[in-house]
Amino acid sequence: LGFLFEAYSQKRRRLGPMAVIHPIRAAALYCRAENRVGAVDLLTALFHDVLEDIHPGKFENGVWKEMESSLFRILKRLGPRNEQRLTENLLNLTKLEDESYYEYIGRLLDHCEETTDLVQIKLADRLDNTLDMRIDLRDPLEGIDFFQVIFQILFVPNYRSKSDEPHPTTSTVLNGARRLHQLFKNAVLLSLVWRKVDRRSGRSFRSLFDAVATASLREAQRTLLHLIRQI
């Protein structure tokens, strides 16, 4: 955790919170779904974005050397075999610069024929990113029937729903295009996982898959309500 806090100390999420919260929450979601988690899988979840986010040029030389030393100590404690496995996991979870998102997820799934651990970590990553898209103090879907509201907005003159009432929101808004891009990523991941991963996989896999699907659907409904109200 000390390495992560140092690595992400200068970075923030798009909605404002410290960036280090994301890998910690993603790891927590993964661990919550699993019955037992080994050291390599836990470190994979915590470090899943490190190769993409952390580069020497972003730190002063002394700080980078200290971070390297900290990381080497962690790897040494794992032993050669587990160190190699962790490295391979992180490489597989890192999108290459010239890859499309579709190609990236396809490559990831090609390395998961014998185990769904990496897929589950990726699902936990996407779940946290999806939940992080909205930090409104009140959910616009709270206490309403989505399809009833859509029908009434479209066909009932001067309709005003409970969700149209002003309510407290945060001062930071996630750009609409970025919101749709996050949902696109979820759609690609879920569709490819559905096609390539054995649907009889364990309870932890199914719970994470269902959680990402549910969170994506809820966010898509919120987005559609917002768009229809602009008509």
Model-derived segments and their meaning:
Residues L1-I231:
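Active-site helical microenvironments for divalent-metal-assisted chemistry
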